Amino acid sequence: MVPADKKQSILFLVNPKSGVSKKKRVPQMVEQYVDHERYDVDICYTQYAGHAYELAKDAAANGVDVVVAVGGDGTVNEVGRALVHTGTALGVIPCGSGNGFARHLGIPIGIKKAIEFINDAEPVIIDYGKINGQPFFCSCGMGFDAVVSSDFAKGNRRGMLNYVKKSLVDWVKYKPETYVVETESMKEEFKAFVIACGNASQYGNNAYIAPFASMRDGLISVSILSPFNTYEVPMMATHLFTHTFDESNHVTTLTTSWI
């Protein structure tokens, strides 16, 4: 912790390509709304994939107190990976397509409100998961959502509408697969449309794939969605956006420390 009478250094890392919102006003808004009595401010724009990770890692090595990811969940993941087990705190100004990390933690959507939130915030410790040796902070998945996320990441357009378009295109050609799921308490075979492992409760846009996931319990919430018929899509979407995904007959839920 930084003594109360000492200013904290804070670096805003802006991803200009995330989401659909314009970020040209970020420097002006930071200058206008940040608490300059608390923070010494620096701002940097990322220039390529992985750049946020590099800049955040350098910042932590140089003793910067707070690094703020200005972007979506991909930017948060890059910055967060660089800051795990360091003395540098992660802040977020959510400007992505879904902003699942920020929404889960109650961070306001909107640059001005998010800056004001940072002005009054104190650091807390949160969990992260690991897959293939890489940390993740919201969720990781296998199946349909992984296919859509991969296709969305490869595209140049962002926003919820484009995500829905990608989903519809992939829906037509996707075939569910069979998985062997093993945890500390079970091992079972599932034919699944999606297997989602949630550290956070939602994908973003308040789509709750793991409604009761917590970032502070040391556990992963797993939702296994079995194949379903096309006419059931509206009901599945309703469950997803009304915090009742676990109540669907097509969903098996697990809570585990590893999978």
Where are the predicted features?
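ATP/NTP phosphate-donor binding region
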Residues: 1-67, 187
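N-terminal glycine-rich "phosphate-gripper" loop used for MgATP/nucleotide binding
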Residues: 69-73
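Gly/Ser/Thr-rich active-site loops/lids in small-molecule metabolic enzymes
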Residues: 157-162, 211-231
